[in-house]
């Protein structure tokens, strides 16, 4: 909605009221209150606000136009001043022209095609004035007139300056200047009231501020979309007869009444008051408000089914009261001169009471709808949607009798009613061409008139600016002359007579009081407007001039007085700086003067605060910005931030656990050359986020713990007799390819000599070459002393094409012994082994064997170990696989303390021979070949001494650490490029046979060897000692444990059955009862941390079943 405020800014609006405000200030308060209430409505986002004053200049009169925003509107309202004439007719004419500026271009008025009530641009104009005499620059205007702009006489086919969707509301301010308890009679009706009634608005008189606010609030109910129409009774002979028969009173007139329009598109227009003539060059003039004639004869209320119609509610008026009182249900409405023949025309709608009987609605149908209802009824009932030629002729005659602008909406309505194409397409083509040409002509004329207006206004604005600049120059010249005139007689006299100085001192106050009238001319006040803003400026300037004059007088008089008390009568008006110098006789007089002198400034400043206009009273942000900001309450509580370091650093909180690497703790103490220990700086500790429960370790589950390392030993071939062998091995950090080749040659010679001297039982001790010394204490080698025993086994002979290879298998029982210092490393074959300590492992007697674990699953149908698990290298870059049949390798377990891992073997070892003990008549040797063991991980199987590669991200919690003490072990050791395996009678069920196939491609094996060598190097740097067990399938058990812990950490309760099912599967694999209880207790502890009460109860019941 378009809301336009027209404010009277004449001189009479500056008169004061009883509340101390001027009438202009009251008008500003009314606008602000209107916007405050309107802002509570959601429809305000579609509103546009305009501001027009009563200035005679058409350019400067429009303060807020189409291009300005809402903030500019508020600011311009505050800046209004009373300095114009009260030519309200010109202001209203400008406001209507301003609203109608773009209506022709948007075709809202729809000239010559009927009036569409749903296609409107509703607008209201609110006039705020004092209702005094209307004046202009030349004389006083006796009658209020609203002329039409001369530029729109030919371009606008509307006879009035307003439209049927624009209304004028006026609030006349008749405030009293003197407060009185007597009720004064209301003044006579203002001259603006008839104009408000013509537009469908209303004129109201406000006698005080309270009634003005109430009237502003009442305007909010008028902000409804709709159009204004006039209703007149139809006068003819039939109407007179019906009125006489029914004894009805004469029907009333209802002029300029509101039809409330809903926000939806309609179908049927209200007909024009003329029939458009195609032969004419222009359209006839139309009235702003259509005049609708109504009949008092009762009519039929039948409407065909599925036929569209429009419905509008009529505001309460004398017509509605007449119909409701006489209970007239339905009457037809007509538009005069709407046909080619002048007269009342045919009905286009009806006035009908609603179902509740408390309001009247206007129903709009097609023109001459009674005839159309008959034709449609014949089409549906008689012809069954198959019209005859006679019906088509009658229907075509109906189309030619109605105004041509009804053809197009009727075509759309019949498509909804039936699927027949009853209206030809070319019946209204001539009318459409005529209307289009006429509308184009009207638009072009309006554009040219607007352009001419713009040029004329710009020229007038330039002339006014020139005149204003000349006036300012002339006023400045007059002010300079006035200042020179005032300064010449008011100069202080230089005569020494005290009387002249006293008289000037006495008259200083009166002179300062008249200073405003001397310096400010009344002509200038009239030109600028005598508003509250100018009053505040005058008071402020007068106060400054009076203060300056008094201070200058005080200083001049006090300088003439001496230190002696001024008791003479000539010094009565002199202010003393020292109160003790005042005589007793002058004390009372001086006391009054001192009071005025001290308190006068403060009183003037306080009074000047209350002389501000309303436009300056709302500047809260400027006032608050000038004040000193308050101290923050939380300044004392804020911590002192450091001025150094990283300003974006954030302290970590909720650190529950701190994990420290054991290698870091071991490296804190280092030995220097003199044998003294000194502390090294602590390394950065890694902080873990969430503390998970500690996992079971080997120390808490097994009674024995040993350190294990990858060792290199020479291979020996023993006969079928018991033999005790002590092997001492050591490992170094790294070796080159040349040293590895020399060591491989030596190993081949030693293997041949040992095989020739092994016919009788003997004991031998084999020691590796002295290694080189390592500088890093964390890379110290490990020396292990292993005592083994063998038992005779029936010998079998296996033929193999591969020679110079022997395999030694021994079952070893390992017991912890004392830790000895490592020997120096000087071997050419060295391995990076970051272990903390070295241990010597020996055993003289074997303890009773533990209960056998469940049998291992079969690897494949042929019981063949994949060739990728055993890698053989030679100098010819050929890696053949070694088939071994009918060998029952024992299960082996190598135990180590917690957080230790088995190191990989050197990547390049040649001339390796594999020896086997207790497997008689098996002697296979190979030349220039080596079997390289992969890095051993606790998460992979180790079957028959074959080690599978590990996963880099395998967790430390495995079943290998839990079953290390319940089975025998096999230690694969290598010395000088040979691999040996020993067994004892305490073995568990293993695979029945191992087949080595020698059918793989050499190139593929070479690639596998290179990849495994790379893995060895990476694992050598990332892994420490590993724990290996082959009593159970490690992958399956470890996956079960990880899955159970993951399910416990999930914040759900529907996975308890899955956890119990997986634990049952795990316990069916594990045969040790203590191991089961330990795993179950650790699972309960983890469930307690995550507060799984129902799961804990199930697990406790499971413990009772195991026990």
UniProtKB/Swiss-Prot annotation:
Residue stretches of biased makeup (Pro residues): 846-857
Protein name: Integrator complex subunit 6 homolog
Keyword terms, alphabetized: Chromosome, Nucleus
Annotated Gene Ontology cellular component terms: chromosome; INTAC complex; integrator complex
Lineage: Eukaryota, Amoebozoa, Evosea, Eumycetozoa, Dictyostelia
Domain MIF4G, first and last residues per copy: 1041-1103
Pfam family, one: VWA_2
Endpoints of the signal sequence: none
GO biological process entries: RNA polymerase II transcription initiation surveillance; snRNA 3'-end processing
Family per record: Belongs to the Integrator subunit 6 family.
Region entry Disordered, spans: 454-515, 542-572, 629-801, 818-861, 946-1034
Main localization, broad class: nucleus
Location in or out of the cell: Nucleus; Chromosome
Bias kind Basic and acidic residues: ranges: 629-639
CDD domains for the chain: vWFA
Native source organism of the sequence: Dictyostelium discoideum
Compositional bias ranges of the Polar residues kind: 976-996
Coiled-coil annotated spans: none
Domain VWFA: 2-195
Low complexity: compositionally biased ranges: 460-513, 546-562, 693-801, 956-975, 997-1034
InterPro entries, alphabetized: Integrator_subunit6 (IPR051113), VWF_A (IPR002035), vWFA_dom_sf (IPR036465)
Domain of life: Eukaryota
Job description of the protein: Component of the integrator complex, a multiprotein complex that terminates RNA polymerase II (Pol II) transcription in the promoter-proximal region of genes.
Subunit details: Component of the Integrator complex. The core complex associates with protein phosphatase 2A subunits, to form the Integrator-PP2A (INTAC) complex.
């Amino acid at each position: 909605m378009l809301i336009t405020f027209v404010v009277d800014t004449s001189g009479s609006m500056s008169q004061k009221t009883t509340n101390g405000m001027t009438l202009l200030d009251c008008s500003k308060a009314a606008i602000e209150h209107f916007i405050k209430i309107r802002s509570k409505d959601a429809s305000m986002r579609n509103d546009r606000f305009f501001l027009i004053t009563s200035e005679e200049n058409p350019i400067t009169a429009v303060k807020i136009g189409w291009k300005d925003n809402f903030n500019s509107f508020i600011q311009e309202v505050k800046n209004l001043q009373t300095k114009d004439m009260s030519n309200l007719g010109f202001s209203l004419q400008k406001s209507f022209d301003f609203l109608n500026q773009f209506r022709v271009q948007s075709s809202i008025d729809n000239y010559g095609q009927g009036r569409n009530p749903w296609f409107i641009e509703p607008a209201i104009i609110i006039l705020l004035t004092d209702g005094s005499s209307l004046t202009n620059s030349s004389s006083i205007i006796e009658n209020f007139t609203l002329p039409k702009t001369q530029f729109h006489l030919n371009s606008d086919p509307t006879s009035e300056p307003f439209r049927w969707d624009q209304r004028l509301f006026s609030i006349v301010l008749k405030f009293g200047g003197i407060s009185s308890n007597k009720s004064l009679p209301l003044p006579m009706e203002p001259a603006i009231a008839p104009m408000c009634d013509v537009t469908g608005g209303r004129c109201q008189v406000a006698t005080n501020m309270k009634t003005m606010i109430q009237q502003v609030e009442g305007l909010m109910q008028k902000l409804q979309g709709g159009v204004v129409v006039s209703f007149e009774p139809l006068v003819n002979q039939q109407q007179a007869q019906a009125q006489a028969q029914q004894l009805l009173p004469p029907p009333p007139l209802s002029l300029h009444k509101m039809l409330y329009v809903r926000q939806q598109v309609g179908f049927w227009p209200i007909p024009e008051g003329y029939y458009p003539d195609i032969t004419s060059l222009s359209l006839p003039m139309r009235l702003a408000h259509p005049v609708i004639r109504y009949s008092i004869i009762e009519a039929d209320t039948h409407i065909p089914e599925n036929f569209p119609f429009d419905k509008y509610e009529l505001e309460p008026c004398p017509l509605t009261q007449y119909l409701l009182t006489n209970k007239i249900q339905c009457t037809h409405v007509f538009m005069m001169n709407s046909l080619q023949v002048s007269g009342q025309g045919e009905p286009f709608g009806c006035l009908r009471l609603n179902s509740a009987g408390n309001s009247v609605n206007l129903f709009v149908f097609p023109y001459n709808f009674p005839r159309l209802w008959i034709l449609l009824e014949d089409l549906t009932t008689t012809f069954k949607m198959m019209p005859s030629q006679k019906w088509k002729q009658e229907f075509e005659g109906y189309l030619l009798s109605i105004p041509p602008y009804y053809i197009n909406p009727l075509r759309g309505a019949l498509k909804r009613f039936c699927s027949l194409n009853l209206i030809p397409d070319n019946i209204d083509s001539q009318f459409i061409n005529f209307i289009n040409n006429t509308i184009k002509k009207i638009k072009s004329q309006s554009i040219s008139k607007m352009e001419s207006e713009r040029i004329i206004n710009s020229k007038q604005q330039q002339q006014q600016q020139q005149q204003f600049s000349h006036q300012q120059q002339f006023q400045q010249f007059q002010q300079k002359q006035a200042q020179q005139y005032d300064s010449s007689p008011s100069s202080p006299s230089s005569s020494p007579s005290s009387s002249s100085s006293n008289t000037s001192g006495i008259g200083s106050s009166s002179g300062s009081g008249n200073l405003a009238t001397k310096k400010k001319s009344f002509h200038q006040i009239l030109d600028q407007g005598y508003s509250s803003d100018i009053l505040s400026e005058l008071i402020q300037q007068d106060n400054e001039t009076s203060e300056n004059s008094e201070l200058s007088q005080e200083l001049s008089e006090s300088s003439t007085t001496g230190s002696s008390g001024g008791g003479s009568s000539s010094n009565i008006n002199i202010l003393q700086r020292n109160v003790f110098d005042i005589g007793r006789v002058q004390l009372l007089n001086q006391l009054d003067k001192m009071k005025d002198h001290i308190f006068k400034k403060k009183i003037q400043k306080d009074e000047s605060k209350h002389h501000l206009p309303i436009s300056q009273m709302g500047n809260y942000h400027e006032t608050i910005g000038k004040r000193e900001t308050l101290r923050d309450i939380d300044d004392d509580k804020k911590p002192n931030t450091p001025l150094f370091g990283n300003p974006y650093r954030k302290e970590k909180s909720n650190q529950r656990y701190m994990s420290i690497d054991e290698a870091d703790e071991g490296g804190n103490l280092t030995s220097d050359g003199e044998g003294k220990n000194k502390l090294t700086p602590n390394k950065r500790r890694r902080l873990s986020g969430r503390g998970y429960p500690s996992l079971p370790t080997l120390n808490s589950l097994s009674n024995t713990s040993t350190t294990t390392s990858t060792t290199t030993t020479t291979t020996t071939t023993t006969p079928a007799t018991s033999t005790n062998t002590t092997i001492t091995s050591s490992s170094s950090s790294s070796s080159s390819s040349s040293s590895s080749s020399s060591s491989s040659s030596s190993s081949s010679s030693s293997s041949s000599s040992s095989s020739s001297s092994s016919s009788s039982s003997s004991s031998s001790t084999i020691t590796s070459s002295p290694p080189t010394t390592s500088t890093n204490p964390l890379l110290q080698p490990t020396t292990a002393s292993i005592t083994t025993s063998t038992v005779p086994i029936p010998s079998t002979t296996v033929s193999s094409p591969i020679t110079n290879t022997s395999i030694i298998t021994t079952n070893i029982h390992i017991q912890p012994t004392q830790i000895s210092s490592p020997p120096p490393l000087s071997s050419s074959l060295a391995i990076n082994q970051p272990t903390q300590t070295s241990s010597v492992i020996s055993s003289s007697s074997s303890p009773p064997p533990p209960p056998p674990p469940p049998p291992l699953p079969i690897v494949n149908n042929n019981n063949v170990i994949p060739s990728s698990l055993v890698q053989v290298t030679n100098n010819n870059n050929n890696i053949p696989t070694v088939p071994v049949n009918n060998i029952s390798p024992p299960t082996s377990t190598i135990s180590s303390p917690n957080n230790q891992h088995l190191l990989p073997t050197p990547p390049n070892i040649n001339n390796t021979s594999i020896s086997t003990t207790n497997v008689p008549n098996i002697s296979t040797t190979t030349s220039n070949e080596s079997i390289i063991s992969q890095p051993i991980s606790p998460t992979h199987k180790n079957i028959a001494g074959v080690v599978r590669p590990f996963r880099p991200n395998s967790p430390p919690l495995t079943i290998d650490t839990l079953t290390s003490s319940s089975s025998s072990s096999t230690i694969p050791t290598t010395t000088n490029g040979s691999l040996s395996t020993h067994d004892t009678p305490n073995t568990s069920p293993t695979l029945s046979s191992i087949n080595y196939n020698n059918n793989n491609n050499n190139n593929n094996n070479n690639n596998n060897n290179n990849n495994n060598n790379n893995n060895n190097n990476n694992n050598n740097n990332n892994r420490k000692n590993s724990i290996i067990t082959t009593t159970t399938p490690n992958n399956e058990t470890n996956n079960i444990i990880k899955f159970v812990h993951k399910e416990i950490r999930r914040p759900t309760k529907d996975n308890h059955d899955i956890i119990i099912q997986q634990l049952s599967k795990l316990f069916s694999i594990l045969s040790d009862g203590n191991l089961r209880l330990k795993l179950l207790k650790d699972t309960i502890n983890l469930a307690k941390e995550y507060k799984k009460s129902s799961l804990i109860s199930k697990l406790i019941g499971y413990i009772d079943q195991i026990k």
